[in-house]
Amino acid sequence: MRALNDSYDVVVVGAGPAGSMASYNASKNGAKTLLIEKSQEIGTPVRCAEAVPRIEEFGINPDPSFIKSYIKGGYLIAPNGKKVVVKGGKTDGYVVERKVFDKYLAIRSGQAGTQIAVKSRVTGIEKTDDGYNVFVNYLGDEYVVKSKIVIAADGVESNIAEYAGLKSKKNPKEICSCAEYEMTNVQLLDNEMMEFYFGDICPKGYIWLFPKGDTVNVGIGVIDSKKRAIDYLDEFLSNPLVEGRLDNAVPVEFKVGGDPVGGPIEKTVDDNIIVVGDAAGHVSPLTGGGIGLSMDCGLMAGEVAAQSIKAENYSEEFLSLYEKRWKEKYYKPLMKDLKYKNILQKLSDDELNAIADSIPENLEEVDVGKLAVKIVAKAPSLLRYFKELL
């Protein structure tokens, strides 16, 4: 196996979608790049529901090797069973096999020139005059690698950002605890539609059913709950809301994970370092989804890193071009989602039912401001929650 070099232009820590896209774009634009992944197999363990937006906009073809289902929309299901159908917009996309998808993105990065080190752990970083010393345990051997730029794409449990003095969000009340079964013998309402359930059955979160070819991802995300996520999920399997459609379901895989849903971190760059993906809070606080966002921000991070190498300028001032780009595109939507999440978490089952009864059964796109007007018109008691949206 090829040993690590003494130095690189860019070292990316974490080979999830954000890290692989960042390393791909850095290499593509001429930077000597190393991608470090702690798992022995990229894409494992899977920790998410595997829904992604239309990936074509990121230059990725929807290859049959990882696309399991095409998604055209979703059902939002209130505690009383009222269904609201949402189609198009953010609900249009795919369910992928993350084990294959993540590896596909890493292979693409490797083909662009990135050196990849699997089963490798960064044990620390040390600031130098012109970058960082990165301490790596690579297949059991210890290395010290010099890098002009470090890209921290090491997920919700990010240590790299903290090593560099950048504050990451690890408040338990800002982490959504998730559990999921991949199951066969599940009867869906529609094989091209996702299902979302809300209320006391999943405190401050939601339950999802995502079609995945011959199987279905049945999962839950909860925040600051009294019981474990898996306990709520097991109770849901026999809930009348699913009308016996899970009675014969058989699990073939179990997954757990955490989503940072407190919004983006305040600062995502400093001298010689960039933070991206879950490590940066590049996740919708409302839905917990972040693969597409992380991929796009990864592309931005890799491009700016390569530009800084060409300019021989690795300062916070130069790297702030990355922060400016991602914030211009995503900061306001993320903060809106944070506001919507905070409202949703305060609603009782009766109030959720009132909302479902107040809005049309079919929506082409969700405009929260317009929906708030309709909700308050039919349920004035909810004004205290929605007045800031009117």
Swiss-Prot record:
Swiss-Prot/TrEMBL keywords: FAD, Flavoprotein, Lipid biosynthesis, Lipid metabolism, Oxidoreductase, Phospholipid biosynthesis, Phospholipid metabolism
Co-factor: note: Binds 1 FAD per subunit.
Keyword Transmembrane appears in the UniProt entry: no
EC number: 1.3.-.-
Name of the protein described by the UniProt record: Digeranylgeranylglycerophospholipid reductase
Taxonomy, superkingdom: Archaea
A Pfam family annotated for this UniProt entry: FAD_oxidored
Residues reported to bind FAD: A18, E37, C48, A49, A51, R98, V122, D278, G290, I291
Protein species of origin: Methanococcus maripaludis (strain C7 / ATCC BAA-1331)
Positions of a 2,3-bis-O-(geranylgeranyl)-sn-glycerol 1-phospholipid binding: V368
Enzyme class label: oxidoreductase
Similarity annotation: Belongs to the geranylgeranyl reductase family. DGGGPL reductase subfamily.
KW Nucleus (keyword) present: no
Gene3D superfamilies assigned: D-Amino Acid Oxidase, subunit A, domain 2, FAD/NAD(P)-binding domain
Function: Is involved in the reduction of 2,3-digeranylgeranylglycerophospholipids (unsaturated archaeols) into 2,3-diphytanylglycerophospholipids (saturated archaeols) in the biosynthesis of archaeal membrane lipids. Catalyzes the formation of archaetidic acid (2,3-di-O-phytanyl-sn-glyceryl phosphate) from 2,3-di-O-geranylgeranylglyceryl phosphate (DGGGP) via the hydrogenation of each double bond of the isoprenoid chains.
One GO term describing the cellular component: membrane
